[in-house]
């Protein structure tokens, strides 16, 4: 839901038990079970009951793990269901009521574990470096905040609390987005979010990261998580007023997501570490031609069309000084977006006679710098030519012939060749003929920091190594190392799925009820100038945004106008809810939520399901689903015909049209 947070939950009948169990402390028959209990909720449970529950569940998990090779994720009982997570010797279990869906039960457990790892790091290291009482306070704080900020509708979707955007001027939302983009230009800052009284105004983070940041903001200052805010005192950094920097830990997947979208941030980092060549200082027309030539490959003449002679020879030493890397070799700008104009590219091309001689130099250079052996059964072709030793002041450049789209190999072949080293610029591919020795050779260019090379087949077998996108912006289908994100399998090792945690900094700046939260690299804490830049670049904008939000949002949220319909809209991308349900649900609203819970479970089990209508003798609920959203609608007005049999006059058949019409004013487009 939007607009406000619910009151503190007094009773949580749906949340029965939660515990963390360390099996490494209970190995023998004489070891007491209580020695392995790291944390148990509710804490007032008798110790004998804690031992009974932890021992029985740990035994069942270990038995199923040994039989199937994978620990169970959900254990059902008569009146309870337990979501299970295993990480080496550690076992987490969350017991919920049977009315909670299986997906929500597992999501709540993952959320709790994510909170702990975000603020305390890996659980194995946390329990070695912190006292158990301090970590128990961390668990108490996380559980309290989850129960306090969870309504009946949020228990179904496990969604975040967001600001009702229909009650806020769009320019204010745009201003919040511009503030975050401005902060991204500062050093070390990756992404962030802006919150107002515990509600999301704008966020660049994943929903899981936003939920962790929300937990930090909702905890009072005197009850902050252990270790929060201790980093500035340890390093002696002087922070601006109302600013706090907390050490946090992110998974490798979350760090990769922070590097995907901020193009300006990536450009800034590369620009600070790469020296641009002098020819970038060209006229606007030449710069546009350079970008066009880099983006659209032009056909290269074959028979001596590339200019050669004194003019080209005079430019080679200059190019060697500007582009030569550690190996002293230079490549053309073919396939790179380095800003070279088409005129310079043509001047760097060699004739066929020069290519033959340069190919002999390549083999000599490879003998001086032997590459790694090729993997698999692919046979590497080595040139049999011999030539004098390559002088140090010689630059070798070559251009590849254009490859039409119809000659490109299949995508599967790309994955097989991506990890092969370049030996002579030629690699024999199974099922193809070797390239003749007179074919042009392309050498791998030098790559700036944070950019890794990728190899793609070019033509019938020649490969061109060119600059790829940064690691963070790699497409999901591209080959390369990727962190494990499997939620269904857990390896029985101490490392587990949360072992690859990366330390980061959480920068928070509070302006009354408005909070700016930024995730930055660990080096931000030691860079006082960067902290001052972030603070001063956003201070005035945050003050203005806070004043406008205070004047725009309605102050009395309790006086909600009665409506003739109920609706609930769930954004799957941002994991937020929009609804017109009251904070205190009536019996009729509970029946609506029961129907929503049932249909949401069906949508999760049947991804191809698009629409459904569920009804009883008195009312009907319409639902539609897409990969991006779920929408539920109920008409509350009494109808003349509402029998349980299909009838053209039945209200259930008109719900789809009414939902599309009435939800437009709430910003929900079902057309």
From Swiss-Prot:
It is linked to Defects in Hps4 are the cause of the light ear (le) mutant which exhibits hypopigmentation associated with defects of multiple cytoplasmic organelles, including melanosomes, lysosomes, and granular elements of platelets. Keywords: Albinism, Disease variant, Guanine-nucleotide releasing factor. This is BLOC-3 complex member HPS4. PANTHER family: BLOC-3 COMPLEX MEMBER HPS4, HERMANSKY-PUDLAK SYNDROME 4 PROTEIN LIGHT-EAR PROTEIN-RELATED. Component of the biogenesis of lysosome-related organelles complex-3 (or BLOC-3), a heterodimer of HPS1 and HPS4. HPS4 and the BLOC-3 complex interact with the GTP-bound form of RAB9B but not with the GDP-bound form of RAB9B. HPS4 and the BLOC-3 complex interact with the GTP-bound form of RAB9A but not with the GDP-bound form of RAB9A. HPS4 does not interact RAB4A and RAB7A. InterPro entries: CCZ1/INTU/HSP4_longin_1 (IPR043987), CCZ1/INTU/HSP4_longin_3 (IPR043989), HPS4 (IPR026091). Residues 269-291, 417-497 are annotated as: Disordered. GO terms for biological process: blood coagulation; intracellular transport; lysosome organization; melanocyte differentiation; melanosome assembly; platelet dense granule organization; protein stabilization; protein targeting. One of its GO terms (molecular function) is protein dimerization activity. Highly expressed in heart, brain, liver and testis. Expressed at lower level in skeletal muscle. Component of the BLOC-3 complex, a complex that acts as a guanine exchange factor (GEF) for RAB32 and RAB38, promotes the exchange of GDP to GTP, converting them from an inactive GDP-bound form into an active GTP-bound form. The BLOC-3 complex plays an important role in the control of melanin production and melanosome biogenesis and promotes the membrane localization of RAB32 and RAB38. Residues 467-477 have a biased composition (Low complexity). One of its GO terms (cellular component) is platelet dense granule. Residues 269-286 have a biased composition (Polar residues).
């Amino acid at each position: 839901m939007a607009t406000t947070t619910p009151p503190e939950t007094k009773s949580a009948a749906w949340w029965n038990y939660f515990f963390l169990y360390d099996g490494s402390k209970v190995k023998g028959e004489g070891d007491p079970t209580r020695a392995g209990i790291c944390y148990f909720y509710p804490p007032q449970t008798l110790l004998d009951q804690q031992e009974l529950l932890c021992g029985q569940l740990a035994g069942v998990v270990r038995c199923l793990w040994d039989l199937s090779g994978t620990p169970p994720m959900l254990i059902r009982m008569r009146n309870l269901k337990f979501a299970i997570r295993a990480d080496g010797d550690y076992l987490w279990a969350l017991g919920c009521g049977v009315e909670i869906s299986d997906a929500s039960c597992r999501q709540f457990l993952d959320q709790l574990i994510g909170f702990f790892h975000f603020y305390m790091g890996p659980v194995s290291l946390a329990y070695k470096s912190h006292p158990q009482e301090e970590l128990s306070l961390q668990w108490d704080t996380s559980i309290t905040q989850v129960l306090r900020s969870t309504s009946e509708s949020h228990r179904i979707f496990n969604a975040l609390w967001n600001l009702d955007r229909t009650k806020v001027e769009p320019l204010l939302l745009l201003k919040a987005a511009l503030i975050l983009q401005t902060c991204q230009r500062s050093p070390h800052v990756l992404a962030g979010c802006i919150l107002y009284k515990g509600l999301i105004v704008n966020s660049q983070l994943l929903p899981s990261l936003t939920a962790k940041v929300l937990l930090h903001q909702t905890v009072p200052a005197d009850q902050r998580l252990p270790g929060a805010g201790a980093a500035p005192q340890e390093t002696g950094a002087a922070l601006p007023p109302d600013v706090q920097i907390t050490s946090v830990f992110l998974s490798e997947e979350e760090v990769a997501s922070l590097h995907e979208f901020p193009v300006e941030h990536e450009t800034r980092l590369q620009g600070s570490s790469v020296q641009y060549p002098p020819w970038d200082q060209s006229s606007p027309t030449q710069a546009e031609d350079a970008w066009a030539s880099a983006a659209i490959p032009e056909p290269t003449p074959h028979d001596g069309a590339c200019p050669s002679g004194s003019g080209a020879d005079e430019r080679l030493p200059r190019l060697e000084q500007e582009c030569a890397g550690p190996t002293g070799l230079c490549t053309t700008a073919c396939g790179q977006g380095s800003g070279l104009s088409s005129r310079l590219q043509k001047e760097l091309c060699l004739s066929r006679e020069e290519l033959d001689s340069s190919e002999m130099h390549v083999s000599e250079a490879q003998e001086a710098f032997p590459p790694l052996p090729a993997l698999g059964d692919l046979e590497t072709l080595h040139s049999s030519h011999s030539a004098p030793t390559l002088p140090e002041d010689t630059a070798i450049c070559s251009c590849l012939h254009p490859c039409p789209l119809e000659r490109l190999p299949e995508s599967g072949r790309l994955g097989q060749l991506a990890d092969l080293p370049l030996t002579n610029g030629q690699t024999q591919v199974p099922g193809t003929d070797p390239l003749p020795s007179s074919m042009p050779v392309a050498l791998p260019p030098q790559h700036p920091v944070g950019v890794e090379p990728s190899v793609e087949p070019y033509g019938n077998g020649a490969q061109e190594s060119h600059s790829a996108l940064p690691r963070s912006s790699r497409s999901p289908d591209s080959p390369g190392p990727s962190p494990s994100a499997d939620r269904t399998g857990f390896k029985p090792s101490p490392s587990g799925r949360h072992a690859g945690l990366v330390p980061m900094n959480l920068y928070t700046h509070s302006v009354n009820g408005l909070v700016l939260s930024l995730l930055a690299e660990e080096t931000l804490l030691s860079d006082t100038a960067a902290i001052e830049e972030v603070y001063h670049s956003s201070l005035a904008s945050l003050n203005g945004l806070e004043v406008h939000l205070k004047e725009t949002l309605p102050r009395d949220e309790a006086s909600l106008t009665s409506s003739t319909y109920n609706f609930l809209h769930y954004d799957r991308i941002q994991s937020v809810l929009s609804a017109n349900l009251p904070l205190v649900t009536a019996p009729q609203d509970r029946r609506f939520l029961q129907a929503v819970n049932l249909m949401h479970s069906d949508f999760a089990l049947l991804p191809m399901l698009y629409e459904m209508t569920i009804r009883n003798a008195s009312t009907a609920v319409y639902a539609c689903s897409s990969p991006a959203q779920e929408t539920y609608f109920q008409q509350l007005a009494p109808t003349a015909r509402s029998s349980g049999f299909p009838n053209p006059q039945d209200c259930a058949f008109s719900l789809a049209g009414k939902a599309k019409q009435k939800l437009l004013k709430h910003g929900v487009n079902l057309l």
